[in-house]
Amino acid sequence: MLKLLVFMQINSNIGLVLEGGGMRGVFTSGVLDAFMKHDVFFRYIVGVSAGACNGLSYMSRQPRRAKISNIDMLAKYDYIGLRHLVTQGCILDPELLYNKFPYEIVPFDYDTYFANIRRGDVFEIVTTNCLTGRSEYLQERDGNSHRLNELARATSSLPYVCKIVDIGGQPMLDGGIADSIPIERAIATGHSKNVVICTRNKGWRDKGKDHKQPRFVYRNYPRLRVLLSRRLKFYNEQLDMVDRLEAENSILVIRPEKEIVVGRMEKDIRKLENLYEEGVVLGNRFIKEHLSKLTAPY
């Protein structure tokens, strides 16, 4: 159903950047639900992996849809697990998530999504091109619902545990491999100020070590292997950039304040509910503290 809303427009030079993080993305869905409750909508959004998937329901103006998909339906359908890797080549159930959910079980409002696109809103989905080893920032502006679903699938296809997804003849995987927090993309597209929703606590860094990928791993994609071999270092550098830009007042960051206890493939419903609710609380607080700086009458 097409929904026409009257709202306060975020200034056009301010973008919204959505980090991924698997099931930690329920925090992002909580923040975005708070934004929708107050009719606060950004005109430019760039999202990665779970961030992009949650952002789709924000662009379609469907409060709680992402929460229902990520938490309520997880308890019912158990769509994370090795059995899906064996039967469908992905640790997440792609047929359920990118076909049955949007078309049948938790219907996605394609009419409203594409109406917002036609009026000039931009929603970029980050994927990693396995041939080039570079990030790509893809859109679906022509009303093709199947392609939009495939973009969501591609940006969420984790290396090693998900099949490569073909997008227009190009092999794609999770956008977080090449660009986990696409602030530089938002700046490059003319957005001098940005709001960034992160899914890690302030100060967190990955303490693991990068390892050179053996040749038998993605043997047809040597540039992807190189990228995977230095992924942790690059992600930590992006977190450093977030802190630096935040200190310079170039960006506003919304991130969990309580210690994160939700894993990438978390299935504990109580933990997920708590993180979602924290997102709602911090989203409401952000609006109260910062909305006047970001909006103009629309």
Which residues are covered by each model-predicted region?
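Patatin-like phospholipase
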Residues: 1-48, 56-298
